[in-house]
């Protein structure tokens, strides 16, 4: 039974499975859940008072909602790939800027501005669109198993990134944020080179696409 199941899973080749896993991993490795879980601590480490850091966290929450709506309104108009690449570039700019501010120990509203740029970029792209792509790229025959693997990879990546943030930030705040910025750059390259555009394509068309690549 296991051999049959394994054969079915790889009936369209391993590439589509690997792409699904990497899509999930990159969604977490850009550091979004660090920004969400540790937002007050990040702002306090940059010199904000406790009350101010909580207010800034609330602002981030509003940004999350607004730019998720932006993604909903634009995903079928602009396509998945352009939004993902644009989001990756925005996240990279935000994280590298925060890394620079941390390195030079610059405290002020600029930190909030660049974290908002980072968060907004994620929420208009990788936040919702990763899930859209996971539901669209896998052929019907393997969708159940493939989606389960991609989701498992996402939770594993989430745990890894979230649990390593405290020791990383203790070692170097600048390098920590630069790492997330670098992951954002890699995610843009990954989407550009590896992800097929699914806008306007039927599940049958996606199935044929993967068949040709086996």
Segment roles from a protein language model:
Residues 1-214:
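Alpha-helical transmembrane bundle of multi-pass membrane proteins
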């Amino acid at each position: 039974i296991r051999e049959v199941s394994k054969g079915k899973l790889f009936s369209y080749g391993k590439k589509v499975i690997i792409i699904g896993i990497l899509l999930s991993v990159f969604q977490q490795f850009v550091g979004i859940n660090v920004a969400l879980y540790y937002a007050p601590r990040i702002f306090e480490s940059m010199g904000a008072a406790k009350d101010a850091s909580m207010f800034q966290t609330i602002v981030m929450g509003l940004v999350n909602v607004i730019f998720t709506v932006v993604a909903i309104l634009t995903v079928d108009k602009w396509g998945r790939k352009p939004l993902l690449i644009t989001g990756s570039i925005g996240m990279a700019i935000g994280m590298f800027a925060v890394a620079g501010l941390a390195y030079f120990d610059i405290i002020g509203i600029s930190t909030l501005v660049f974290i908002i740029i980072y968060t907004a970029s994620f929420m208009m792209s990788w936040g919702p669109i990763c899930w859209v792509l996971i539901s669209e790229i896998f052929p019907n025959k393997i969708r159940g198993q493939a989606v389960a693997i991609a989701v498992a990879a996402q939770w594993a990546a989430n745990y890894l990134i979230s649990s390593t943030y405290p020791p990383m930030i203790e070692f170097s705040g600048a390098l920590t944020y630069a790492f997330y910025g670098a992951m954002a750059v890699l995610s843009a390259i990954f989407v550009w080179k590896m992800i097929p555009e699914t806008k306007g394509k039927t599940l049958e068309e996606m199935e044929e696409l993967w068949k040709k690549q086996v």
